[in-house]
Amino acid sequence: MSETGPSLQRPATRAARLSAIEQALATHIITSQSQLSKILIDEGIAVTQATLSRDLDEMHAVKTRLKDGTVAYAVGRSVVASEGEDVGERGEAQMSRVLNGLVTSVAAAGNLVVVHTPSGAAQYVASVIDKQPIEGVLGTIAGDDTVMVICTNDDTAVSRSDWLLSLASK
């Protein structure tokens, strides 16, 4: 186990590969398919250039020019940050807008964060949390009005609980 927690293990499936590609595009500035291929290999996913090209096409990934002039892949509405730009601020602003009206309480319990919402809103809140690359968060489980955020350890759960509460309070 590393300092940041256990590494994510993925099955050798198409869905897992597409998820890994989406995550790589959201967290790295990817300028070429060979660069993306190397990142996937580091994740334990071997892929041919032809498959990678088809996957990017299917995901509607396009090359876009960043503010600094770099041309990089982006998917849909996602915008990759250039050097020095904080991806977290943009993600926090988006999360804050959603969480502000939907979170009724937040509590840490062991390595979990329990987030309460109005009836019917938990799935949406969990989806918003899952779409952000949040350090120390492994994933979420949602019911009707409760989201369980699974963290790598107890300390991370406490800090993520405080952070989610602050986002919901903005």
From Swiss-Prot:
Gene Ontology annotations for the cellular component aspect, listed alphabetically:
cytoplasm
Which BP terms from GO are recorded? L-arginine biosynthetic process; protein complex oligomerization; regulation of arginine biosynthetic process
- Where in or outside the cell? Cytoplasm
Q: What is its main location?
A: cytoplasm
One family name in Pfam for this protein:
Arg_repressor_C
Q: Which InterPro entries match?
A: Arg_repress, Arg_repress_C, Arg_repress_C_sf, Arg_repress_DNA-bd, WH-like_DNA-bd_sf, WH_DNA-bd_sf
Query: Which keywords describe this protein according to UniProt?
Result: Amino-acid biosynthesis, Arginine biosynthesis, Cytoplasm, DNA-binding, Repressor, Transcription, Transcription regulation
Please give the pathway this protein is involved in: Amino-acid biosynthesis; L-arginine biosynthesis [regulation]
Q: What is known about what this protein does?
A: Regulates arginine biosynthesis genes.
| Record family assignment | Belongs to the ArgR family.
Q: Which PANTHER family match?
A: ARGININE REPRESSOR
Protein name in the entry: Arginine repressor
Q: Which species?
A: Bifidobacterium longum (strain DJO10A)
Q: Species lineage, top-down?
A: Bacteria, Bacillati, Actinomycetota, Actinomycetes, Bifidobacteriales
